[in-house]
């Protein structure tokens, strides 16, 4: 099986063309491939499949390192767009794809950045899903013998965002896994720790569902900005500083889609016998 290794701000991926190759990934195979000592090593596996709708170009599938399939990965979407152009699967700059729960438009810019229309953030608890009676800007949760104030949103996948004073000292490794599997998140969640530097700039670390802390989480950056705007903390255009680098997020508010712009890097091509 041929594959490519790619990354978006250090969030790394194994990307596989299932348009011209016949491949099948079991959870056990994915876990073995994800092993950084015995396999390829990655945060997520991205699979390019033929479209199910003639109006679309591709179907986009995402698997976490633990073998679970998820519906959204923002950094992966940028790498997906670069991959299909690099491999000659399309020469379009505006690439229309379906995911497990919707559709996306990926735009490759002249400077090789990728702009992703992430759709409109959804704050309805049932959409996340999150156990709550109604939409609130801030929810109170109990975890690890602490009272946590957080925002909750779906970007096509579930996110919980906590504001912290200093992201460098945030309890990502201890609080992240506890909140990820909290009973109020029946499908688990990605946990973002956000430091507001100013209205146009935040620092962010994300403990990803099924992957742990990563160098960058695109949908997590989108979720943090959406929650920050909902809570009146942020402007419509925000620079998000992650451990792996910078993303630019723009959202005009309810009724509008949210846009993420950032890099996607091809590292190498490989071949593995399954």
UniProtKB/Swiss-Prot annotation:
It catalyses: (2S,6S)-2,6-diaminopimelate = meso-2,6-diaminopimelate. Its EC number is 5.1.1.7. One of its GO terms (biological process) is lysine biosynthetic process via diaminopimelate. Pathway: Amino-acid biosynthesis; L-lysine biosynthesis via DAP pathway; DL-2,6-diaminopimelate from LL-2,6-diaminopimelate: step 1/1. Keywords: Amino-acid biosynthesis, Cytoplasm, Isomerase, Lysine biosynthesis. GO terms for cellular component: cytosol. Pfam families: DAP_epimerase. It is found in: Cytoplasm. The active site is at residues 73, 217. Gene3D superfamilies: Diaminopimelate Epimerase, Chain A, domain 1. The record marks 159, 208 as: Could be important to modulate the pK values of the two catalytic cysteine residues. The keyword Ion transport does not apply. The keyword Cytoplasm applies. The record marks 268 as: Important for dimerization. GO terms for molecular function: diaminopimelate epimerase activity. Substrate binds at residues 11, 44, 64, 74-75, 157, 190, 208-209, 218-219. Belongs to the diaminopimelate epimerase family. Catalyzes the stereoinversion of LL-2,6-diaminopimelate (L,L-DAP) to meso-diaminopimelate (meso-DAP), a precursor of L-lysine and an essential component of the bacterial peptidoglycan. Homodimer. This is Diaminopimelate epimerase. It comes from Escherichia coli O6:H1 (strain CFT073 / ATCC 700928 / UPEC).
